[in-house]
Design a protein with these regions (language model features):
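Short alpha-helical DNA-recognition segment
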Residues: 19-44
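Residues within the helices of the helix-turn-helix
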Residues: 10, 29, 69
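DNA major-groove recognition helix of helix-turn-helix/homeodomain DNA-binding modules
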Residues: 55-70
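Short polybasic/polar patches that bind polyanions
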Residues: 14, 33, 62
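Short, charged recognition helix plus adjacent turn
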Residues: 72-77
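Residue-level signal for the short linker/turn that defines the boundary of a DNA-recognition helix
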Residues: 7, 25-26, 52-55
Length: 77
């Protein structure tokens, strides 16, 4: 049995960017800088081609002020 981890990072990030008084804070580059990763890593996570480490998943949750379960979802294939 295999599964799939899906995430809502792109949707959440874009929503925050639209609602923020400082939208640059929520660009891929801005988020990457705050997480200590490259912009390419953020892009890969958003596309679902890279699953972040547990440590990075917690950093994402903290950046968004959300629980990990609100960002990532496991689905059976």
């Amino acid at each position: 049995m295999t599964g799939l981890i899906v995430n809502r990072i792109k949707a959440i990030r874009e929503q925050r960017m639209a609602q923020s008084s400082n939208p640059e804070h929520w660009t891929q580059e801005g988020l990457a800088r705050r997480l200590g990763v490259t912009r390419q890593t953020v892009i890969s996570i958003e596309k679902g081609t890279y699953n972040p480490t547990l440590f990075l998943a917690f950093k994402l949750a903290r950046a968004f002020e959300m629980r990990i379960e609100e960002i990532f979802e496991y689905r059976d294939e």
